[in-house]
Amino acid sequence: MGVSGSKGQKLFVSVLQRLLSERGLHVKESSAIEFYQFLIKVSPWFPEEGGLNLQDWKRVGREMKKYAAEHGTDSIPKQAYPIWLQLREILTEQSDLVLLSAEAKSVTEEELEEGLTGLLSASSQEKTYGTRGTAYAEIDTEVDKLSEHIYDEPYEEKEKADKNEEKDHVRKVKKIVQRKENSEHKRKEKDQKAFLATDWNNDDLSPEDWDDLEEQAAHYHDDDELILPVKRKVDKKKPLALRRKPLPPVGFAGAMAEAREKGDLTFTFPVVFMGESDDDDTPVWEPLPLKTLKELQSAVRTMGPSAPYTLQVVDMVASQWLTPSDWHQTARATLSPGDYVLWRTEYEEKSKETVQKTAGKRKGKVSLDMLLGTGQFLSPSSQIKLSKDVLKDVTTNAVLAWRAIPPPGVKKTVLAGLKQGNEESYETFISRLEEAVYRMMPRGEGSDILIKQLAWENANSLCQDLIRPMRKTGTMQDYIRACLDASPAVVQGMAYAAAMRGQKYSTFVKQTYGGGKGGQGSEGPVCFSCGKTGHIKRDCKEEKGSKRAPPGLCPRCKKGYHWKSECKSKFDKDGNPLPPLETNAENSKNLVKGQSPSPTQKGDKGKDSGLNPEAPPFTIHDLPRGTPGSAGLDLSSQKDLILSLEDGVSLVPTLVKGTLPEGTTGLIIGRSSNYKKGLEVLPGVIDSDFQGEIKVMVKAAKNAVIIHKGERIAQLLLLPYLKLPNPIIKEERGSEGFGSTSHVHWVQEISDSRPMLHISLNGRRFLGLLDTGADKTCIAGRDWPANWPIHQTESSLQGLGMACGVARSSQPLRWQHEDKSGIIHPFVIPTLPFTLWGRDIMKEIKVRLMTDSPDDSQDL
């Protein structure tokens, strides 16, 4: 029945008493409770899984019989068998005699029906005059015997004895019917012969006839149940079975039917519209399938209220047209108390929005009481009168409120905390984002705009770099396509390719992945005036009055037309020596206006990929300050560089030379803005007697980083220091500075007798040495394809010798050997006679160093 506990007991007792009372049987409440407790003891599955149907009830009977055989008949309550038989008769809509005859396997259903029909026909025709005939008395006797057999001991006798006894009773019934039919036939033949032998012309009767006539007349009015003789037809036909009045519904459905007749509509859900058109709003009430509610509760308990399967079950429930009261009962029964409060709050908000949207749009006004089931629509009987349009709004708001319930553990700031992980693919992140957004609002233009905005803001830094060029013009498909292969290796390769083509990283990404209507390569020409794409210089609409006027006569040397800050003269026009140029204040002003302090720092980015040999070195006095109150002097890169995580620490040249002011020492620190972009500057100390070029130690903190020529990367702080009489190792520092960094070592000599191995790089076979002990793979210059891009590095190789002018591949290469493969960034050395396979490949292909002693063998 689906209900257990005290509530299930009360429901079963009330239904049992009502069903038996309709048959004229009264069962005490104590007897009904005793039977229910015995039923739970015999069939514990019935309260939860069973129902009042013939199949389950027969199963209960079999288990009662088994229980009696094991524990004895005394263990069964006195009223158990009568109650069980009465309910079985109700469920099958048959009499006790038919039930008993149907259980006899040797008697077919057709024979049983024919025998019963003849029995009833013979008994009805036996009534002639006076009292009831002897046939009725004999039939009643047999029926009483059969009834006693049914109610007294239906299961105590053995199966074989039961069948034999049932056969005997059926044979007796047939004999009674046949005997009465033969007697009736003989009597009619005798009356017909006497009628034909009568002389109708002679009115005189014999004395015996007159005596017989007077005797019959004396008893003419003795019996009130006078039945006139009916002439039987020659062709005997089987009488039609009487149509019985259908029994009322049983079980929980019957209880609800009785409640509807009395006006109690508490359980009248869902409201089903049976009309063929939308205009037919005649409601019919059906119980919501119990299995559906169980499935919904199980899904909420095991997977959560916001799981996709749970939402699918909610949509199935929503197809049943529930009223506001029904939705509240369903949510309260399946959700946790906290989630129910969230659902109710969201449902009320959605209902208020619906009332505001539908105001003045419909003929029938929709009120908040209709949607919430409050006020005059508080009772379920008033809610069933709601129109179909109102019930649609109720269902829509209820489903949206359910979808707004957050997953377990995420109660607030769902969208703000939905970030893409560093190793998470972009398409997986978009899937989680769409699920969260659609749980809060329906699909539409508003949800698409929100998803696109969050797809950019909540993406990781790598995907943001890929999306940034197409953020405003691209679609979600462009975003996903741009981040399809997002990985640090891909970004590094794209940065190398952009540097080789002399383009900005953002421009290269936009041209590679598209990002708008024109697709790849649709940016158009670049304006040389404003730097924007889509037009040329002569069509530029930017203001042209902001150009800087040409310089006049230099006020410092008075020998040429150039700016004072760019004056390099050491003598004026009269030959007098000039003092050092005071550039701090001047450069500060120029920096505010956007003017670079030196020719090198104002050079065009990307045009010069190396050092400018014609530019003289700068001194400490030439370095600018960001603002008048800046504590540090800005150090700028004088070379375009691309840094990756595998490059480690690199040295960036600044072309700044000369000794520091007396009594000071220098401290190099980074800039916070560069660190946010992924560039990490290692602090360094510049001695007061250092006369060489100041270089900055940098490395990539997160992903590949591009440093443009003239870009400010670090600051130089001039600090006073205290001299102590400590021992001095060297008299002067001179120009000696940093040593070699990012070394790649090999420790064995190279000869032709070494073992060689063929490995494919991007589909091209290379032959190289195995036992060199190199940490990184080094490709010989003669083996490197000319069309594969490379770039120079600041690293050098050390081993038995020294290799300078080392280059590196500008793109990641995929190597493959048999079933093994991977990604490497090899070095390219022009002077190397052989290609050297490093540990970055050998450890992946499981190369082992073997000796005669197994203990000394190890994997690379």
UniProtKB/Swiss-Prot annotation:
It comes from the Viruses. Nucleocapsid protein p14: Binds strongly to viral nucleic acids and promote their aggregation. Also destabilizes the nucleic acids duplexes via highly structured zinc-binding motifs. PANTHER family: ENDOGENOUS RETROVIRUS GROUP K MEMBER 24 GAG POLYPROTEIN-RELATED, IGE-BINDING PROTEIN. The keyword Hydrolase applies. Keywords: Aspartyl protease, Capsid protein, DNA-binding, Hydrolase, Lipoprotein, Magnesium, Metal-binding, Myristate, Phosphoprotein, Protease, Repeat, Viral matrix protein, Viral nucleoprotein, Virion, Zinc, Zinc-finger. It holds the Pfam family zf-CCHC_5. GO terms for cellular component: viral nucleocapsid. The record marks L99, L100, F195, L196, L228, P229, G254, A255, F269, P270, Y496, A497, H745, W746 as: Cleavage. A lipid is attached at G2 (N-myristoyl glycine). CDD domains: HIV_retropepsin_like, trimeric_dUTPase. This is Gag-Pro polyprotein. Signal peptide: none annotated. Magnesium ions are required for NC-dUTPase activity. A motif (PTAP/PSAP motif) lies at residues 305-308. One of its GO terms (molecular function) is zinc ion binding. Gene3D superfamilies: 1.10.1200.30, 2.70.40.10, Acid Proteases, Human Immunodeficiency Virus Type 1 Capsid Protein, Retroviral GAG p10 protein, Zinc finger, CCHC-type. A zinc finger (CCHC-type) spans 525-542, 552-569. Residues 154-193, 572-631 are annotated as: Disordered. The gene is gag-pro. It catalyses: dUTP + H2O = dUMP + diphosphate + H(+). Its cofactor is Mg(2+). It comes from Mouse mammary tumor virus (strain C3H) (MMTV). Residues 584-601 have a biased composition (Polar residues). The active site is at D771. Residues 154-169, 178-193 have a biased composition (Basic and acidic residues). GO terms for biological process: proteolysis; viral translational frameshifting.
